[in-house]
Curated annotation (Swiss-Prot):
PANTHER family: C-1-TETRAHYDROFOLATE SYNTHASE, CYTOPLASMIC, C-1-TETRAHYDROFOLATE SYNTHASE, CYTOPLASMIC-RELATED. Keywords: Amino-acid biosynthesis, ATP-binding, Cytoplasm, Histidine biosynthesis, Hydrolase, Ligase, Methionine biosynthesis, Multifunctional enzyme, NADP, Nucleotide-binding, One-carbon metabolism, Oxidoreductase, Purine biosynthesis. The lineage of its organism: Eukaryota, Metazoa, Ecdysozoa, Arthropoda, Hexapoda. InterPro entries: Aminoacid_DH-like_N_sf, Formate_THF_ligase, Formate_THF_ligase_CS, NAD(P)-bd_dom_sf, P-loop_NTPase, THF_DH/CycHdrlase, THF_DH/CycHdrlase_cat_dom, THF_DH/CycHdrlase_CS. This is C-1-tetrahydrofolate synthase, cytoplasmic. It comes from Spodoptera frugiperda (Fall armyworm). It catalyses: (6R)-5,10-methylene-5,6,7,8-tetrahydrofolate + NADP(+) = (6R)-5,10-methenyltetrahydrofolate + NADPH; (6R)-5,10-methenyltetrahydrofolate + H2O = (6R)-10-formyltetrahydrofolate + H(+); (6S)-5,6,7,8-tetrahydrofolate + formate + ATP = (6R)-10-formyltetrahydrofolate + ADP + phosphate. CDD domains: FTHFS, NAD_bind_m-THF_DH_Cyclohyd. GO terms for cellular component: cytosol. One of its GO terms (molecular function) is methenyltetrahydrofolate cyclohydrolase activity. It comes from the Eukaryota.
Length: 933
């Protein structure tokens, strides 16, 4: 309370204590809470410095981190605006104030500068948006500090504002106009006067409350004031005073000594409205920080789903996708809690998300983690991607839960081959589907370039070593620059690995120079192929080096498809950029003639790889058909690699969704391949614990496993698949039972999602559902999201929510300290049902070599057909006791796993007789892609 004629110190102290308590309360909710104020000053006026020091002291007393950003006098308006934009975009700055006047040698529009400050960070309250809000009575924004301080002081007197006659003397944009509006919204009767007002003193004498901001020293005399009035003096004017050392003193617009004889309350100058203005600045800053915290900790996003109107029967996927207008990706990013500097837009429907999100939200608890896998599929697929999207559409758009789908980026090989796109289907898909299935943001192309540059450097190094003697080779590797030789950092790392401690190139012995310069790659033991993101069977075996310029140094090699590259697996498994860098450096591309590994770092490639892959570190934000968020990142093959989207994308999604949210991601193929690798490789690398596994099943696939005729892409289905056949279905249920059992072995609840197809009968669907529940499924539900979108997956969403709330007892299938053969044995028996494992002599020899090199402590990434639980794609159902034959093995040292090969696994698919390219065209009038799906 501000007592009559009393000091304002108790008022200021009370406000300071309130703000200090608010900061403490916020820190109790969020350990990393730090209210931050940026004070921008142009030039160095001493009067401005005085005000800034006041603000810095006030901030420190409250617990606000205030930064004084002093810019030079020669700064231009464009440069100043760039600084403000940077502060606007920073999630670590909550409030921005630009100290006026701007002391610049260049003309700068101060109004443009104040309007450049984001309304959400305009703690000075001078942005036109915030001023306009005050004008119309919307006080949800930031109120200008001096007017807010005036109203606060009046309230602290205990005087009721409503119904009082208020006179405001002054109409400035900063004080007079906004304070008059504020008092009007406090239900006072407000009269605004100014220097042209006639009979001014008579009007002021009618005021119960008088606010003066005219800018003329001691203009208002005691005779102008109504007895008992509250007087708020906003002026500060220097006048001559020979008794002062400076020769002047500061006075307000009111003759204070006269006013205190008449009024009940009068603010002193200095020490009145000035400190109160600073207090309101601090209040606005704390409010801004708390608003950001409230948004961060809100249980649900302010997500606005997109409405869909499903047609029956559903039209083609591309027709459905184009019937929906996506929301602008910047709008979706804002809804899910991203800041503009964390979002790099690629057009209006996709954007890269900065890894800095993980640092900003490091104290945020993660969301529930769900993996979607399947039974052993038919060549047509059973709808895992569609189920994944239907699930998150149901969770977000219909159950109001924060949820992400995290997906792999599809390769263009299958897109132009036979499979088509991988964006889901029907009313559960990613949009725009053409962008999702084609180049997207170029990550696969970046991986292709990095992979092939490494291959080019390796072959070039082999050539140069074959055509040069030790001395010239060393001199070219470590050239003199301005007469001085110097090792690069990556060369120093090689020296360290070689046990050479010298750092001056000129001090190396001839033997050390030779050891450093020669990699001595054994061309018969090269493990690194070039890649291309297309299906091209004629690249499965090629000869390189046939040009006369290569002097006869030819060798046989091959191209793989880009998503089979180890680099793609590393991007998917890296926990941060430093981890990715280390993994890239450790990639083994060949063995030397002594049998030692030759790495990418030995070839000097690590830094160049990082540069090529820089943008590919970040996941891409897209949206589902119902406007819910989807993160797309990396696309490692599910057979030769681990077949999962990236750890980084999952971690960003889990932070953004929050502890009450859900993140669902897909594992390639069935539980025997994709889900096992998700748990034993991806979760082991990430440290994240899954809460639930969803196994996708169809009646069609189970009939195939019961002995139905083969299912082939592009061929009509046999009648048994479109007519009720409970006997055939019953025989195939064993495959579903095996996949449920596989999930349960990891200690996570398994929800079975039964995708409905048009020809499925109620009896068939119920048979599958009853079997699943009796054989270990946590829940089994029917799903119709392909036809209905999220509404068709509500039962699935509810089952997943319930499963995630139950207690998961997740554990890995095997410990890493077991031998390579022991780990393979466990996977073969537990996941596939094998009785024993056989190895070729060559495989056994390689296992011994890998063990000697320390690779035996890596997890196992089995390369096996996805069409059977066995190694034979023709064997269906769930056989047991069979022999699994390992006929090849290699180590992906950078990715960090050993890959046993079961049967022939191609790393380069081929095009079929009639690939989908026959149907694809571009409408030259509309620019739309036709026939892609």
């Amino acid at each position: 309370m501000w007592e009559p004629q009393g000091s304002l110190d108790p008022v200021l102290e009370s406000i300071e204590n309130e703000l200090r308590d608010q900061v403490a309360e916020a820190r109790s909710r969020w350990a990393g809470f730090d209210a931050r104020l940026a004070i921008v000053q142009v030039g160095g006026r001493e009067d401005s410095n005085v005000y800034i020091r006041m603000k810095l002291r006030a901030a420190e007393n409250i617990g606000i981190t205030a930064e004084h950003i002093q810019l030079p006098r020669d700064i231009t308006e464009t440069e100043l605006l760039a600084n403000i934009t940077s502060l606007n975009e920073s999630p670590y700055v909550h409030g921005i104030i630009v100290q006026m006047p701007l002391d610049s040698v260049h003309p700068i529009d101060s109004h443009a500068i104040t309007d450049a400050v984001s309304p959400d960070k305009d703690v000075d309250g001078l942005n036109t948006i915030n001023e306009g809000r005050v004008r119309v009575g919307d006080l949800s924004g930031f109120i200008p500090c001096t007017p807010a301080g005036c109203v606060e002081l009046i309230k602290r007197t205990g005087v009721t504002i409503a119904g009082k006659n208020v006179v405001v003397l002054g109409r400035s944009r900063i004080v007079g106009t906004p304070v008059s509006e504020l008092l009007k919204w406090e239900h006072a009767t407000v009269t605004v006067c100014h220097s042209k007002t006639k009979n001014l003193s008579e009007i002021t004498k009618t005021a119960d409350i008088l606010v003066v901001a005219i800018g003329r020293g001691e203009m208002v005399r005691g005779s102008w004031i109504k007895p008992g009035a509250v007087v708020i003096d906003c002026g500060i004017n220097p006048i001559s005073d020979p008794t002062k050392k400076s020769g002047q003193r500061l006075v307000g617009d009111v003759a204070y000594e006269e006013a205190v004889q008449v009024a009940s309350h009068v603010t002193p100058v200095p020490g009145g409205v000035g400190p109160m203005t600073v207090a309101m600045l601090m209040r606005n800053t704390v409010q801004a920080a708390r608003r950001q915290l409230d948004r961060l900790l809100a249980p649900t996003w302010p997500l606005r789903p997109l409405r869909i109107t499903p047609l029956s029967p559903p039209p083609s996927d591309i027709v459905i996708a184009r019937s929906q207008k996506p929301k602008d990706i910047s709008e979706l990013a804002h809804e899910i809690g991203l800041f503009s500097n964390e979002v790099s837009q690629y057009g209006r429907t996709k954007a890269k998300i900065s890894l800095s999100v993980l640092d900003r939200m490091r104290n945020q608890q993660g969301a529930k983690y769900i993996v979607v896998a399947g039974i052993t599929p038919t060549p047509l697929g059973e709808g895992k991607s569609t189920t994944l999207l239907g699930l998150v559409q149901a969770l977000s758009a219909h159950r109001g839960r924060n949820s992400f789908a995290v997906m792999r980026q599809p390769s263009q090989g299958p897109t132009f081959g036979v499979k088509g796109g991988a964006a889901g289907g029907g009313y559960s898909q990613v949009i725009p589907m053409e962008e999702f299935n084609l180049h997207l943001t170029g990550d696969i192309h970046a991986g292709t370039a990095a992979n092939n540059l490494l291959a080019a450097q390796m072959d070039a190094r082999i050539f140069h070593e074959l055509t040069q003697k030790d001395g010239p080779l060393f001199d070219r590797l470590v050239p003199k620059i301005k007469g001085v030789r110097k090792f690069s950092p990556i060369q120093l790392r090689r020296l360290k690995r070689l046990g050479i401690t010298k750092t001056d190139p000129d001090t190396l012995t001839e033997g050390e120079k030779s050891k450093f310069a020669r990699l001595n790659i054994d061309t018969s033991k090269i493990m690194w192929n070039r890649v291309v993101d297309l299906n091209d069977r004629y690249l499965r075996k090629i000869t390189v080096g046939q040009s006369p310029t290569e002097k006869g140094f030819t060798r046989e090699t091959a191209f793989d498809i880009s998503v089979a590259s180890e680099i793609m697996a590393i991007l998917a498994l890296g926990r941060d950029v430093e981890d990715i860098k280390e993994r890239l450096a450790n990639m083994v591309v060949a063995l030397d003639k002594s049998g030692n590994p030759v790495t990418a770092d030995d070839l000097g490639m690590t830094g160049a790889l990082l540069v090529l892959l820089r943008d590919a570190f970040e996941p891409t934000l897209m949206q589902s058909l119902e406007g819910t968020p989807v993160l797309v990142h990396t696309g490692p093959f599910a057979n030769i690699r681990h077949g999962c989207s990236s750890i980084l994308a999952d971690k960003i999604a889990m932070k953004l969704a929050g502890e009450n949210g859900y993140v669902a991601t897909e594992a390639g193929f069935g539980s025997d391949i994709g889900m096992e690798k998700f748990f034993d490789i991806k979760c082991r690398a990430s440290g994240d614990t899954p809460h639930c596994a969803v196994i996708v099943s169809t009646v069609r696939a189970l009939k195939m496993h019961g002995g139905g005729p083969p299912v082939s892409a592009g061929m009509p289905l046999n009648d048994v698949y479109v007519q009720e056949n409970l006997e055939l279905l019953s025989k195939g249920l064993c495959n579903l039972g095996k996949h449920i059992s596989n999930g349960n072995k990891f200690g996570v609840p398994v929800v079975v999602a039964i995708n409905k197809h048009g020809n499925d009968t109620p009896a068939e669907l119920n048979l599958v559902k009853e079997f699943a529940v009796k054989n270990g499924a946590f829940r089994a539900v029917l799903c119709d999201h392909w036809a209905k979108g999220g509404l068709g997956a509500l039962e699935l969403a509810d089952a997943v929510i319930e499963a995630c709330d139950s207690k998961s007892k997740f554990d890995f299938l095997y410990p890493l300290q077991l031998s390579i053969q022991e780990k393979i044995q466990i996977i073969a028996k537990e996941m596939y049902g094998a009785g024993q494992v056989e190895y070729t002599d060559e495989v056994l020899e390689k296992i011994k070599t890998f063990t000697d090199m320390g690779y035996d402590k890596f997890p196992i990434c089995m390369a096996k057909t996805s069409n059977s639980l066995t190694g034979d794609p023709a064997v269906k159902g769930a056989p047991t006791g069979f022999t699994l034959k390992i006929n090849g093995i290699f180590a992906s040292v950078g990715a960090g796993f050993v890959v046993p090969m079961v049967g022939e696994i191609s790393k380069m698919p081929g095009l079929p007789t009639r690939p989908s390219i026959y149907d694809i065209d571009l409408n030259t009038k509309t620019g739309e892609i036709e026939g892609l799906f």
